[in-house]
Regions:
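Nucleotide-sugar-dependent
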Residues: 233, 288-295, 302-324, 331-340
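Nucleotide-activated donor-binding/catalytic signature segment of Leloir-type glycosyltransferases, i.e.
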Residues: 249-252, 256-260, 267-293
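N-terminal subdomain of nucleotide-sugar transferases
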Residues: 1-52, 56-57
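Carbohydrate-associated surface elements
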Residues: 37, 182, 201-204
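A charged, aromatic-enriched C-terminal amphipathic alpha-helix characteristic of glycosyltransferases
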Residues: 358, 368-403
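Conserved donor-binding/catalytic core segment of Leloir-type glycosyltransferases
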Residues: 216-243, 258
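Membrane-proximal helix-turn-helix segments that form the acceptor-binding/catalytic region
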Residues: 119, 126-131, 156-176
Length: 408
């Protein structure tokens, strides 16, 4: 098959789509990606891509088409310009027929890896309509509800506008993959999407996340949060729990919290840690993917949290699969699919989002476990991952659905 992927972000930016595309190339498919100019997460165009350099390139067998993109910088105005510059330029490129397969023919299908914003799907709709090809959409961020996390009011004009835009995008898709089971009901009820068009396809973890022997000859219990640090992640709950832990005599000097990642709320969370005068927390910023297994190896358990009162709270963050692939127990302040998965896997402790007291109690429960009991939780996490979230299962399932959609 000849497959055109559309996503505003791609290698060298740190997104899993690169891994998916390269695997499909290994399976014998011709793969191209219509993407933006790298500028995430710092908000500045990468040095190697300035002055119109590398607008077309090939990375590990994947053909890359880069469309005009204004760097997101670090403020709201430029983020909006960033969103619309790619959405419009990529769509115009499709309309004028700029993106072709190696032999000059059309691609067999178009697949949008839909992160934020939902407008990045416009180019895929244009391709579908221009060439009469099936359109697949993999929904990673649900719009317009993702805007609520950023403070947009559900009854406000901005929300209503993007509700209309989102409905058009989702209804234009021939097939929709969702990362969480709860998204199925959302699409059916909010956008009247037929259930048969929606398929549950949970994310997987990169191959480098494998179980490693936990270092037990240490006096501390290390708890690690890894991933994006934004409003949706609600790190405030974890930091307040860290503050409460410091007031518990038998845990004050024993438990340490590690935060690995970057995002719009990083500075605010560092400021909150200072205001709480926390001595049991460390922030490391964004680290290369290759360094993450080392952080996991040093961790006794991994942390996950999300805000409540939103469809976002019911999602299954991709970090959960990475945690489980590494064979790590999970301690979370979260509901929805993550709560279901952790309970089914019997691999950790879950409390409602925002409930600091219950999170503290769960951390204390974990600390009272023996090394053998913690290791058992980790083994159960890895076992569940292999049964439900493995990369081989994901890629085969995706490949089969792409073929079925193309042939139908």
């Amino acid at each position: 098959m000849k497959i055109l992927f559309v996503c505003q972000h791609y290698k060298p930016e740190p997104f899993r789509l690169s891994d998916i595309c390269e695997d499909l190339v290994q399976r014998g498919h011709e793969v191209a990606v219509l993407t933006g100019i790298p500028n995430y997460p710092e908000g500045e165009i990468y040095a190697d891509y300035r002055k119109r350099k590398k607008r077309r390139e090939t990375i590990n067998g994947v053909a890359i088409f880069r469309s005009y993109t204004i760097a997101r910088r670090q403020n709201t105005l430029y983020r909006i310009l960033n969103y619309f510059s790619f959405a419009l330029s990529s769509t115009i490129g499709v309309i004028f027929g700029r993106y072709k397969a190696k032999d000059g023919s059309d691609f067999d299908c178009v697949f949008v890896n839909q992160l934020s914003p939902v407008m990045m799907a416009w180019a895929s709709i244009a391709y579908k309509n221009k060439y009469n090809k099936p359109m697949f959409l993999y929904c990673m961020d649900v719009w317009p509800d993702s805007l609520i996390v950023g403070g947009v009011k559900e009854n406000g004009l901005i929300y209503k506008i993007f509700e209309f835009v989102s409905k058009k995008v989702y209804q234009a898709s021939d097939y929709i993959f969702v990362t969480s089971l709860s998204f199925k009901d959302y699409f059916v009820k909010k956008f009247n999407i037929p259930l048969h068009k929606i398929t549950y396809l949970p994310q997987y973890a990169e191959d480098l996340f494998v179980p490693n022997e936990l270092k037990t000859n240490k006096n501390t219990i290390d708890l690690t949060f890894a991933g994006n640090i934004g409003k949706a992640q609600n790190l405030e709950t974890i930091l307040k729990a860290a503050s409460a832990i410091e007031q518990i005599p038998d845990l004050a000097k024993r438990v340490h919290f590690h935060f690995v990642g970057d995002g719009t709320e990083l500075l605010n969370m560092q400021k909150l840690a200072c205001e709480l005068e926390l001595e049991n927390t460390s922030f490391y910023g964004r680290r290369p993917l290759e360094e993450m297994p080392d952080f996991y190896t040093k961790s006794d358990a991994m942390l996950v949290s999300l805000i409540g009162d939103s469809i976002i709270s019911r999602t299954l963050p991709g970090k959960v699969q990475s945690y489980m692939a590494a064979g790590k127990p999970i301690i979370g302040a979260i509901s929805g699919d993550t709560q279901r998965v952790v309970k089914e896997a019997k691999c950790g402790f879950i409390s409602p989002e925002g409930n600091v007291d219950q999170l503290v109690r769960n951390i204390r429960k974990f600390c009272l476990l023996s090394v053998e009991e913690r290791e058992k939780l980790g083994r159960q996490a890895r076992c569940y991952y292999e049964e439900q979230f493995s990369k081989e299962w994901f890629m085969t399932y995706l490949e089969n659905h792409l073929k079925e959609g193309f042939l139908s």
